[in-house]
């Protein structure tokens, strides 16, 4: 088997998956969707106001942001 594929063996069979490149139109579409701003993680109203002024399209109010959880040795989601 030549090339840039992935082979996964399940029991006595094998499933192959070739690496596909996203077309330019998909990349342009993603860039256009993200153009309006970002979603920011905040812990209080002051941070939400700062995020809004900086151009955030939305905020997520959390008890603790993932960066703080990781800094304290915890495990947090990765985005």
Curated annotation (Swiss-Prot):
One of its GO terms (cellular component) is plant-type vacuole. One of its GO terms (biological process) is pyridoxal phosphate biosynthetic process. Pfam families: SOR_SNZ (PF01680). It comes from the Eukaryota. InterPro entries: Aldolase_TIM, PdxS/SNZ, PdxS/SNZ_N. Belongs to the PdxS/SNZ family. This is Pyridoxal 5'-phosphate synthase PDX1-like 4. It comes from Arabidopsis thaliana (Mouse-ear cress).
């Amino acid at each position: 088997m030549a090339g840039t594929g992935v082979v996964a063996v399940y029991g006595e069979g094998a499933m192959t998956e070739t690496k596909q490149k996203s077309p330019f139109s998909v990349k342009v579409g993603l860039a256009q969707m993200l153009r309006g701003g970002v979603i920011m993680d905040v812990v209080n109203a002051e941070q939400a106001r700062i995020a809004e002024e900086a151009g955030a399209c939305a905020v997520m109010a959390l008890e603790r942001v993932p960066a703080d959880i990781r800094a304290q040795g915890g495990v947090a989601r990765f985005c």
